[in-house]
Amino acid sequence: MDPNKVEISRLEALPQDLLREIVAKIGVKSAEDYHNCILSCKELGASANDERVLKTLNLALLVKKPLSCRKHLLIMKKCLANNNPDAHYIKGIIWYFNLDHCDVDLHHIGIAANGGQKEAIYMYAMLLLCRGRTEEGKTYMSQLEWAKTPPWLKRVGNKSKLH
């Protein structure tokens, strides 16, 4: 082995676009796995601030506990700047219910709902209905497809009726 030759790892040999795609796919599934991934090596860590990664980063743990996002302000700011639906939902919930900025942050919940975030669709629909914007609220509610009966329930439905 030649001591003057610098060896590169297989990961370093991959194109940066592919590395960003890997990090983005991991981020969609789990924020914890994303965090571990970007800490694992500098090549993957370089993709941490990529627009595609931040737009699709799964913030499900923060969606469940929005007030805990105060511990993660930097990643929240980055995700908001890249139109991450989860980040908009979290900001909207905090500002709407906790800080009482109803008009401004109904907008953030709306962005999240339009981005397909299920909790945001429900919350936005309910808030619109409560504000008297009935048709708009019904439109968002219909996106949840609750009116459709799943096939498995149709099969079970007849057997479980109480008479």
From Swiss-Prot:
Pfam family, one: TPR_27
InterPro entries per record: At1g67623-like, At2g35280_TPR_dom
Domain (F-box) ranges: 8-57
Protein name, as recorded: F-box protein At2g35280
Organism whose genome encodes this protein: Arabidopsis thaliana
